[in-house]
Regions:
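Alpha/beta-hydrolase fold catalytic core
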Residues: 1-42, 64-67, 107, 134, ...
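Active-site loop/oxyanion-hole signature of alpha/beta-hydrolase fold enzymes
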Residues: 10, 20-21, 64, 70-113, ...
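Conserved HGGG/HGGXW glycine-rich cap/lid loop of the alpha/beta-hydrolase fold
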Residues: 26-82
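Short beta-to-alpha linker loops that shape the active-site pocket of alpha/beta-hydrolase fold enzymes
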Residues: 73-78, 142, 266-267
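Flexible "cap/lid" loop of the alpha/beta hydrolase fold
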Residues: 123, 127, 133-164
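Conserved alpha/beta-hydrolase catalytic His-Asp/Glu region
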Residues: 147-152, 165-227
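Conserved loop-alpha-helix segment in the C-terminal half of the alpha/beta-hydrolase fold
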Residues: 230-266, 272
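Catalytic active-site module of serine/aspartate enzymes centered on a nucleophile-bearing elbow/loop
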Residues: 257-299
Length: 299
């Protein structure tokens, strides 16, 4: 979760439900700035306990660089529908197919950006079919399972969800402090937004948290598979990360032959810790990616 989520989108952005072959998904769709040449479209996937609002502070600086940005709530996240208690609906393969349906509904090839858990879902989508995508950026998202310390926090959360209501669990999270992958009500931007963080938590389906929390603790290393995919890769993180230590992300970037960016002064959520620097690094990468024609699906 990005703890500094901003719930007020830019003035020109549209919040709506994106209709896809796999259902509707809540999105914030922010256009290219007036007078700026359009360069491409970006599909943004949030992390565990997060939502599309985690990318709010990136929309305007990326629009100024020529990029339309579409941030999405995945199945069962915040304002997107999903089963309340059936974890099977949140299997990683199902979430990956949702991403392919989302990009198809946008009607154009897109740069894919996944934060944390969203990066692992993005990786799974690209491994199913890379052809709808122009590039893949993994933001604070590592090669395999999360660190032992974060696994322990996620287990605490999953245990609490087995016996408590979402509202009761939220109160426990406040008492726990701000773990990177559990998500606490840390500062939000603007009056009333801490309460909106609570509303986001209450809108998230318990089964989504249980299933994806388990995925974070068991995800295998699929970097070798990903490296065989013919896409440009970008590994971006803050200067400190307890979920996937920075040296692990450095090594993953080498294995992927990826561009590597470390955002000074940022931790697990550079998108909210240092949005201007993060947007600049993202746009610099995308500016250098050639737009190739659609090729045959990856097998």
């Amino acid at each position: 979760m990005s703890s500094n989520a901003a719930f007020t989108p830019p003035p020109d952005a549209r919040a709506y439900r994106l209709r896809t072959a796999r259902g509707e998904f809540a999105v914030v769709d922010s256009p290219v700035a007036d007078g700026v040449e359009a360069k491409g479209t970006v599909l943004m996937l949030p992390g565990f306990t997060g939502s599309k609002e985690d990318f709010t502070l990136l929309h305007e600086p990326l629009g100024a660089r020529g990029y339309r940005t579409v941030a999405v709530d995945g199945r069962g996240q915040y304002e997107s529908d999903g089963p309340e208690h059936d974890e099977a609906g949140y299997a990683q393969a199902e979430l990956a197919r949702d991403v392919l349906a989302q990009v198809a509904a946008l009607g154009t090839r897109a740069h894919l950006l996944g934060h944390s858990l969203g990066g692992q879902i993005a990786r799974a989508a690209v491994l199913l079919d890379h052809t709808p995508f122009v590039s893949l950026t993994l933001m604070s998202s590592g090669p395999a399972r999360i660190s032992v310390s974060q696994q322990q926090r996620v287990k605490l959360l999953r245990d609490a969800l087995d016996t408590m209501t979402m509202a009761e669990v939220w109160d426990v999270i406040q008492a726990m402090g701000p773990p990177e992958e559990v998500g606490a009500p840390a500062p939000a931007h603007g009056p009333g937004e801490p309460e909106r963080l609570r509303g986001r938590w209450l809108g998230t389906r318990p089964a989504q948290l249980l299933a994806t929390g388990r995925q974070l603790c068991t995800e295998p290393d699929r970097v070798g598979e990903l490296a065989a995919v013919p896409l440009p890769f970008h590994v971006l993180s803050g200067a400190y990360d307890d979920t996937w230590p920075v040296p692990l992300l450095d090594e993953m970037a080498v294995r992927l032959d990826a561009r590597r960016t470390v955002i000074a002064g940022a931790e697990h959520s550079p998108n909210t810790d240092r949005p201007e620097a993060t947007a600049r690094a993202l746009a610099d990468f995308w500016d250098g990616v050639p737009i190739r024609p659609r090729s045959a699906p990856h097998q």
